[in-house]
């Protein structure tokens, strides 16, 4: 009824965690895109649905979300298996993990890529936005005006053009 009255809604289904077949049917019925978080991709094996080769058009890809550590922070605390698998899959040694995860998100077939400024800037855990379940000390990170450089603008423009993520 809501969609009939309002049309297609800008809703992203947070389909993280345990998702039943019924939930997936409902998500597809209403054409809500699902979430693909790259930081979740390397904990298992090649069949992990968060790996880019499993992304679908009707999804939104993130290197990490506001509820995750930055990519640099994630790498620092990842298990040895996660680091080894990510290094092999992404073809990196972890040196530029944030830049690699950002580029991987842009390269995904997902309709939408959402990238945090913290990851674009390659910041560590001190720039983490939120830690779910903790009631204080979060949501305080602010983008320093000095971070908005011509170099950053060129990077974002280049990635947008390379991966056809520029506005029509």
What are the functions of these language-model segments?
Residues 1-168:
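Catalytic cores of glycan-processing enzymes that make or break glycosidic bonds
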């Amino acid at each position: 009824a809501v969609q009939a009255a309002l049309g297609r809604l800008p809703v992203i289904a947070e389909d993280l965690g345990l998702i039943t077949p019924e939930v997936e049917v409902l998500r597809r019925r209403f054409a809500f895109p699902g979430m693909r978080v790259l930081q979740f991709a390397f904990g298992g094996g090649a069949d992990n649905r968060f790996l880019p080769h499993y992304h679908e058009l009707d999804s939104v890809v993130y290197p990490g979300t506001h509820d995750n550590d930055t990519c640099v922070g994630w790498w620092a605390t990842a298990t040895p298996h996660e680091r080894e698998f990510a290094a092999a899959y992404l073809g990196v040694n972890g040196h530029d993990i944030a830049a690699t995860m950002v580029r991987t998100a842009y390269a995904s077939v997902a309709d939408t890529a959402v990238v945090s400024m913290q990851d674009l800037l390659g910041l560590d855990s001190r720039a983490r936005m939120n830690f779910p379940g903790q009631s204080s000390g979060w949501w305080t990170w602010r983008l320093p005006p000095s971070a908005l450089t011509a170099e950053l603008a060129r990077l974002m423009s280049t990635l947008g053009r390379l991966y056809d993520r520029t506005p029509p």
